[in-house]
């Protein structure tokens, strides 16, 4: 049978399916040349989400948070990872473990 072994793709699928379950219309977006993994829209509100396995270096953090930092509106921006700690944010962008994200 078919088996996905790419953990990053599995994590993205979890986030995508959770957003669908919550009733969001989902798009992949770009801001300039920067990809935004998911832009969810529901009832006139937006949510921007980047998905990464881990934020284990400044370069990874710069890439994941940097794409969202370029968006100049006041809608929520979240980086979802498989990390287990919670509560961190970076310049107003929330860093959320997947387990916590799925319970919201």
Task: Tell where the protein language model's regions lie, with residue ranges.
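A cross-kingdom feature that marks ATP-driven nucleic-acid transaction machinery
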Residues: 1-104
